[in-house]
């Protein structure tokens, strides 16, 4: 079988003379038309530090493709900076960008009959957007992560972007002054790379490595270290080999490999967003996966890594401690990983991990010994109850108690809630409800990092619950429950909550309950009127019409 079986449609035969004429104008010569054409989906952007260094990686991959007798074709994909748009109307476009990225990669690769694609991304939605496209197309592909930012430093402490969000709450509660607030701002982000804790970008890159769609150790490398360039070039070489062997994404992205990814997400203390994104990736790959599968995996897998946001360390520390392969080897040895899954290199997981130690080095405490986990079970709990009959996602790290019952403080937007927090109107024991922020209602399912960070900064992280039909940043921790489904915009129970109602969040019992009589709930439901859409034109209006429930991954196809 030829290496260019797809691109032959545009390079072979007399009838393709015009096609070849165009290709000659972008660098093809007589000897190139029998070579595989490989797309380089480059997410480079100066919008965000996450994507600032991607062009160098794309150029390294491009050169390696040429040396491997392939013809690279580079094209751009967009990015949204979650950190910069956070807390604004702009954040409504973040989850939308996942679909735009997926659609743009699919469009370019399919339109140009490419034989493979190397996708290079950095900020949060780059990863799932690329993988959704890769899974849909089933064209040989590999993902290259742009790398993590190194930690900032101030007063002897490591800083991340979440430090800056939390500093806002510390400032409004008079725990720090304006000078210290400015110093945190100046030191939190020292250079290029994605946000440094086990936030969404590092969670998804780690999961892709575990799934076999990225190279070993690549997901925890620092963006500015030389090994990142080497890894990008090596990824290109591996992809060309996969094209020749016809190793396709759906050979790799299977039910078992997704379970491997979920196991690693639990073990590293990863982001709630991984639930949403893997539901969408599984859908694209035609793999059956439900929100309940995450709860099943949670009960089996301990949290092994002491990583921010609720822990002490960042992704570069994890890299030095042994990286994702060390975590995977521990899971494999205890029957929590499928070692027979194939990877993009053609090797199985078990073969890749063969020489990795069974336990982490004793001179570090980023990765715990198996018999001394941070938590004996996973941290991402799927709750259900009358407030979320389709389910919701709770992150239960960094809290003293996994249960709270308290009066509802109800807000119909993130901005209204944030104003109340900064005005010191939220009290210990309250359960904050932020609604009409779901996939359809927002639209776009904004992340509530600003409110949760402000609560933590004010010292309320352990004593206040927060539930929303929106999302949370990977930098969020505390008694937080997101992805509540059905959402308020479609008449979910969260739309019926009133100020002062009693709400119970119980992560141990996996329960999210509005504590009012059934007849009262039925009366409120009969009275509820659907709101008018917030947008009637443009991409947000289109998205609101197409997007599914969060319980299905907020998919649009």
Swiss-Prot record:
Keyword Metal-binding tagged: yes
Pfam name, any one: ILVD_EDD_N
Location of N6-carboxylysine modifications: 125
Ion transport keyword on record: no
Positions that bind Mg(2+): 82, 124-125, 447
Family note: Belongs to the IlvD/Edd family.
InterPro entries on file: DHAD_IlvD/Edd, Dihydro-acid_dehy_C, DihydroxyA_deHydtase, DiOHA_6PGluconate_deHydtase_CS, ILV_EDD_C, ILV_EDD_N, IlvD/EDD_N
Function: Functions in the biosynthesis of branched-chain amino acids. Catalyzes the dehydration of (2R,3R)-2,3-dihydroxy-3-methylpentanoate (2,3-dihydroxy-3-methylvalerate) into 2-oxo-3-methylpentanoate (2-oxo-3-methylvalerate) and of (2R)-2,3-dihydroxy-3-methylbutanoate (2,3-dihydroxyisovalerate) into 2-oxo-3-methylbutanoate (2-oxoisovalerate), the penultimate precursor to L-isoleucine and L-valine, respectively.
Intrachain S-S bonds: none
Protein name, as recorded: Dihydroxy-acid dehydratase
Cofactor: [2Fe-2S] cluster; Mg(2+)
EC number: 4.2.1.9
Catalytic activity: (2R)-2,3-dihydroxy-3-methylbutanoate = 3-methyl-2-oxobutanoate + H2O; (2R,3R)-2,3-dihydroxy-3-methylpentanoate = (S)-3-methyl-2-oxopentanoate + H2O
Gene Ontology annotations of biological process type: isoleucine biosynthetic process; L-valine biosynthetic process
Pathway: Amino-acid biosynthesis; L-isoleucine biosynthesis; L-isoleucine from 2-oxobutanoate: step 3/4; Amino-acid biosynthesis; L-valine biosynthesis; L-valine from pyruvate: step 3/4
GO MF term (any one): 2 iron, 2 sulfur cluster binding
């Amino acid at each position: 079988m030829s290496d260019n079986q797809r691109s032959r449609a545009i390079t072979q035969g007399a009838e393709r003379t015009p096609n070849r004429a165009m290709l000659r104008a972008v660098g093809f010569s007589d000897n190139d038309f029998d070579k595989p054409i490989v797309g380089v989906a480059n997410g480079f952007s100066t919008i965000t530090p996450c994507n600032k260094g991607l062009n160098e990686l794309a150029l390294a991959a491009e050169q390696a493709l040429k040396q491997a007798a392939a013809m690279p074709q580079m094209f751009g994909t967009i990015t949204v900076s979650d950190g910069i748009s956070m807390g604004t109307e702009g954040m409504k476009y973040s989850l939308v960008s996942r679909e735009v990225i997926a659609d743009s990669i699919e469009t370019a690769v399919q339109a140009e009959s490419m034989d493979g694609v190397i996708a290079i991304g950095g900020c949060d939605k780059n990863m799932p957007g690329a993988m959704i496209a890769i899974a849909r197309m089933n064209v040989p592909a590999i993902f290259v992560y742009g790398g993590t930012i190194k930690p900032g430093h101030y007063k002897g402490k490591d800083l991340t972007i979440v430090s800056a969000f939390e500093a806002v709450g510390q400032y409004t509660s008079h725990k720090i002054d304006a000078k210290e607030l400015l110093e945190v701002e100046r030191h939190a982000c020292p250079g290029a790379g994605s946000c440094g804790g086990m936030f969404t970008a590092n969670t998804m890159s780690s999961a892709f490595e575990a799934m076999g769609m990225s190279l070993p150790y690549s997901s925890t490398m620092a963006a500015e270290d030389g090994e990142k360039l080497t890894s990008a070039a090596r990824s290109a070489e591996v992809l060309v080999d996969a094209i020749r062997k016809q190793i396709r994404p759906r050979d790799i992205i299977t039910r078992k490999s997704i379970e491997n990814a979920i196991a690693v997400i639990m073990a590293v203390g990863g982001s709630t967003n991984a639930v949403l994104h893997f539901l969408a990736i599984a859908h694209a790959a035609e793999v059956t996966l439900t929100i309940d599968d995450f709860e099943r995996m949670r009960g089996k897998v301990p949290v092994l890594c002491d990583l921010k946001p609720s822990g002490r360390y960042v992704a570069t520390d994890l890299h030095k401690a042994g990286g994702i392969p060390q975590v995977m080897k521990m899971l494999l040895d205890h029957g929590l990983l499928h070692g027979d899954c194939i990877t993009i290199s053609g090797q199985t997981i078990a073969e890749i991990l063969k020489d990795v130690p069974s336990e982490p080095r004793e001179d570090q405490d980023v990765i715990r010994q198996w018999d001394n986990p941070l938590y004996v079970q996973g941290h991402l709990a799927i709750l259900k109850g009358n407030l979320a009959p389709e389910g919701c996602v709770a992150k239960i790290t960094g809290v003293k108690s996994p249960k709270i019952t308290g009066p509802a403080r109800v807000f119909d937007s993130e901005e209204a809630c944030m104003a109340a927090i900064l005005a010191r109107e939220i009290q210990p024991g309250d359960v904050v409800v932020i609604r009409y922020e779901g996939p359809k209602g927002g639209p776009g399912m904004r992340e509530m990092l600003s409110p949760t960070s402000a609560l933590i900064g004010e010292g309320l992280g352990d004593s206040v619950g927060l539930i929303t039909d929106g999302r949370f940043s990977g930098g969020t921790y505390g008694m937080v429950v997101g992805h509540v489904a059905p959402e308020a915009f479609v008449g979910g129970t969260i739309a019926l909550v009133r100020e002062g109602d009693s709400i119970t969040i119980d992560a141990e019992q996996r329960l999210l309950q509005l504590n009012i009589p059934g007849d009262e709930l039925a009366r409120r439901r009969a009275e509820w009127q659907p709101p008018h859409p917030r947008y009637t034109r443009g991409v947000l209006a289109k998205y609101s019409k197409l997007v599914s429930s969060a319980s299905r991954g907020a998919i649009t196809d």
